[in-house]
UniProtKB/Swiss-Prot annotation:
Extracellular side: 87-298, 372-382, 449-456, 478-491
GO biological process entries: adaptive immune response; autophagosome maturation; calcium ion export; cellular response to calcium ion; cellular response to pH; endosomal transport; iron ion transmembrane transport; monoatomic cation transmembrane transport
Glycan attachment residues as annotated in the record: N220, N230
Free-text activity regulation comment from the record: Channel activity is controlled by multiple regulatory mechanisms in different subcellular compartments. Lower pH by itself has an inhibitory effect on channel conductance. Channel function is transiently modulated by changes in Ca(2+) in a pH-dependent manner; pH changes modify the aggregation state of unitary channels; a negative cooperativity between extracellular/lumenal Ca(2+) and H(+) is suggested. Fe(2+) channel activity is potentiated by low pH.
Region described as Extracellular/lumenal pore loop: 107-121
Residue spans that sit within the membrane without traversing it, per the record: 457-477
Renumbered ranges of motif Dileucine internalization motif: 573-578
Gene behind the chain: Mcoln1
Organism field: Mus musculus (Mouse)
Chain ranges on the Cytoplasmic side, renumbered to this chain: 1-65, 322-350, 406-427, 514-580
Region (Disordered): 1-38
Protein name: Mucolipin-1
Motif (Dileucine motif): 11-16
Family: Belongs to the transient receptor (TC 1.A.4) family. Polycystin subfamily. MCOLN1 sub-subfamily.
Length: 580
């Protein structure tokens, strides 16, 4: 019989010994593993990473998701083509009207002279201003297009008039270059003259129009050149785009907001002249087109696209969810049965990046299609936003086709090479970006005043990127050669700058970049080569030797993996290079 002291010592030892019953996992031994349970988990994991063809052989389930993606590619591409044809007509109509306005309202304008079109004398400036207003007043008689005035379209300074002629100048300004003195009050004053087109009776000659309704008041304009900032002419015109009849669509009504600017903020003796337009598209009030087609087919087709993408979204989202559930089951199983934690990278293997790509494309397609329906109903006019949404979604849909090519060894070279080379390429690009940005800032601050290609940071980046690809080398050097007489020091610096950049990036950076890609290709081109070691998850799955045609995958339908097409990965004996 044990003594009380012995019993107390035994109880103390038992309490101080780690035990699962006291809420701690330290020192716990994994629960015994049932061979059947573990084999069933391996089999479900292997099925989850099978290709659609292997899943069909394993359970006889048709790859419905694959067939749905093929249908989605067709309908999305057809939709994009139809919208592209319509959008092309809109952009063409807008650009051609802008060109027509420049020829109508800018005195002496010629195509391609936007950057050099300017006034250099006071007489030229007055003539250009009066010419633009005169052309506006007689526009219905001279233009080839059908335009209508917009009463009250002169902007906030028009006071309800159709056209506003405004000059902006400093409140007080006195400049005396002879004595190197100036006196400027930087407050800006805006003076405007309102002009309305006359309501011409039928029997009045056009040359007498200037004297009706006081429209000739703009002729009394007096510019304060010594303190002038700019002169602006703002008005609106309406027209109808009949080109849409080509695509069997109802024409749209357009309102062009036109702004002519005579810019003198530099006070350099040169006043650039530019014309800018903004377009507003709205539905015509009482459209009447004989024998025009019905747009119900386009609406029905858009609805089909939305339904197809919605179904694709649901199936892909369900597959992602089932992958997440299977991952949790695997993590819990490995901890309870083997006492091992699963790393983050192994968990991410359950996340199919291709499904995320397809889900993103579905969201963009649905958003773009809804916007397209609004545009065709004349409730929206965001053609550019709709184009970006539909174009990006179509790009992602077609890129998603590569996933199904990765199920074949010979078609998987591109994806496998990118997968192996991507980490090294990203690190390499980070180092190169530092040098590239340094050249951008240096070129902008030093060469910007002397070279048109270095006037802004974005232009510098575009110029240097073109030089890397071997484009416009001679033109870039020649433009700096013309500036040699202005500053020999800057010209010498430009030679060192350009030669060092071209030599560094073409002969070294590009060569190393290509070497990284080539090295990755050499790694994976050998049979069985993947460029990376197999993870513990892959090694665990490979212990399942059941082939898809063994019939064992048909047992137990309560699988946590997708019922249709999941992320494809061939069996290990095939030695295929599959990227998920």
């Amino acid at each position: 019989m044990a003594t009380p002291a012995g019993r107390r010592a035994s109880e103390t030892e038992r309490l101080l010994t780690p035990n699962p019953g006291y809420g701690t996992q330290v020192g716990t031994s994994p629960a015994p593993t049932t061979p059947t349970e573990e084999e069933d988990l391996r089999r479900r994991l292997k099925y989850f990473f099978m290709s659609p063809c292997d899943k069909f052989r394993a359970k006889g389930r048709k790859p419905c998701k694959l067939m749905l993606q093929v249908v989605k590619i067709l309908v999305v591409t057809v939709q994009l083509i139809l919208f592209g044809l319509s959008n092309q007509l809109v952009v063409t109509f807008r650009e051609e009207n802008t060109i027509a306005f420049r020829h109508l309202f800018l005195l002496g304008y010629s195509d391609g002279s936007d950057d050099t079109f300017a006034a250099y004398t006071q007489e030229q400036l007055y003539q250009a201003i009066f010419y633009a207003v005169d052309q506006y007043l007689i526009l219905p008689e001279i233009s080839l297009g059908r335009y209508a005035y917009v009463r009250g379209g002169g902007g906030p300074w028009a006071n309800g008039s159709a056209l506003a002629l405004c000059q902006r100048y400093y409140h007080r300004g006195h400049v005396d270059p002879a004595n190197d003195t100036f006196d400027i009050d930087p407050r800006v004053v805006t003076d405007c003259i309102q002009v309305d087109p006359p309501d011409r009776p039928p029997d009045i000659p056009s040359e007498d129009l200037d004297f009706l309704d006081g429209s000739a008041s703009y002729k009394n304009l007096t510019l304060k050149f010594h303190k002038l900032i700019n002169v602006t002419i703002h008005f609106q015109l309406k027209t109808i785009n009949l080109q849409s009849l080509i695509n069997n669509e109802i024409p749209d009504c357009y309102t062009f907001s036109i702004l002519i600017t005579f810019d003198n903020k530099a006070h350099s003796g040169r006043i650039p002249i530019r014309l800018e337009t903004k377009t507003h598209i709205q539905e015509c009030k009482h459209p009447s087109v004989s024998r025009h087609g019905d747009n119900s087919f386009r609406l029905l087709f858009d609805v089909v696209v939305i339904l197809t993408c919605s179904l694709s979204f649901l199936l892909c989202a369900r597959s992602l969810l089932r992958g997440f559930l299977l991952q949790n089951e695997f993590v819990v199983f490995m901890w309870r049965r083997r006492g091992r934690e699963i790393s983050l990278w192994e968990r991410l293997e359950f996340v199919n990046g291709w499904y995320i790509l397809l889900v993103t494309s579905d969201v963009l397609t649905i958003s773009g299609t809804v916007m397209k329906i609004g545009i065709e109903a004349k409730n929206l006019a965001s053609y550019d936003v709709c184009s970006i949404l539909l174009g990006t979604s179509t790009l992602l849909v077609w890129v998603g086709v590569i996933r199904y090519l990765t199920f074949f060894h010979k078609y998987n070279i591109l994806i496998a090479t990118l997968r192996v080379a991507l980490p090294s390429v990203m690190r390499f690009c980070c180092c190169v970006a530092v040098i590239y940005l340094g050249y951008c800032f240096c070129g902008w601050i030093v060469l910007g005043p002397y070279h048109v290609k270095f006037r802004s940071l974005s232009m510098v980046s575009e110029c240097l990127f073109s030089l890397i690809n071997g484009d416009d080398m001679f033109v870039t050097f020649a433009a700096m050669q013309a500036q040699q007489g202005h500053s020999s020091l800057v010209w010498l610096f430009s030679q060192l700058y350009l030669y060092s950049f071209i030599s560094l990036f073409i002969y070294m950076v590009l060569s190393l970049f290509i070497a990284l890609i080539t090295g990755a290709y050499d790694t994976i081109k050998h049979p069985g080569g993947t460029g990376t070691e197999k993870s513990e998850l892959q090694a665990y799955i490979e212990q399942c030797q059941d082939s898809p045609t063994s019939g064992k995958f048909r047992r137990g339908s309560g699988s946590a993996c997708s019922l249709f097409c999941c992320c494809g990965r061939d069996s290990p004996e095939d030695h295929s290079l599959l990227v998920n």
